[in-house]
Amino acid sequence: MWIADNWQDYSLIDTSGGEKLERGGKYTLVRPDPQVIWDSDKKHPSWRSADASYKRIGGGGSWRINSLPESWNISYGDLTFKIAPSGFKHTGLFPEQAVNWDWFRDLIKNAGRPIKVLNLFAYTGGATVAAAKAGASVVHVDSSKGMVARAKENAQLSGVGEAPIRYIVDDCKKFVEREIRRGNRYDAVIMDPPSYGRGPNGEVWKLEDNIDSLVALISNILSDEPLFFLLNSYTTGLSPLAMRYIVELRLPTQNRTIEAEELGIPTEVDAHVLPCGSSVRVCFGRF
């Protein structure tokens, strides 16, 4: 398991009864999490005094705010992100991804050449900002105008607002198909697809139906000297081994190493690790 344990500005305090208690900056939140299938004593006082909590109601849910601004910032090393609770329990950041940021930032910094990164399903740009901060040029693609706008804010906050980042609102699969026809190539590709979603024109995305064909397309946009490929998943039931097998089948086979693991974040109260999805990492030409 790859564990994101280098945070200072974020912590997973405790978990119990389908919920997690988190601290982001100076604010505490309670949010639902399907991985938390156990009950604990909830002895930590912040369970009762959290600044906000998200409660599921029927097929949806809503935030219950006690004392919380509309948004605030938290940092991970030299990266800074805007946090803003929104619908579907989200805040605009997946902190477990920090362990992946550390991995590919090191690859980019030590590549010894300019690196061009394609970030698909790029959301609010955590990976985009991390790659740009390491010196890469980035093409950031997401179907949501609002998320792309937030990514631009995060780039400004992290000091890479003027970096070579190209922001595109588009259906990711269609964008990749066009890039293949144009002959554009990338040294690294990051994919963080949702379990389910819709494109800007109502296109329906379901991970299980699309992931194999999309990874197959990626092999056609990698440069002659690719650096890395990263695939993330939050789909319950899609194991790291299944994802790894797809990647093994679809990506170039020469000079590569492939690893697949769950991601996790340790809790403050007892140091147990909460599973937070999984990733497949491919490193080309480094052994």
Where are these regions (language model features)?
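C-terminal catalytic and target-recognition region of SAM-dependent MTase-like enzymes
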Residues: 226-287
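Conserved alpha-helix/loop element of class I SAM-dependent methyltransferases that forms part
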Residues: 95-113
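S-adenosyl-L-methionine
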Residues: 144-190
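Conserved class I S-adenosyl-L-methionine
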Residues: 113-123
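Non-catalytic substrate-recognition/targeting regions of SAM-dependent transferases
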Residues: 6-22, 29-95, 102
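Conserved SAM-binding motif I beta-strand of class I
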Residues: 137-142
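S-adenosylmethionine
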Residues: 172-253
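Conserved SAM-binding loop of SAM-dependent methyltransferases across substrates and taxa
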Residues: 124-136
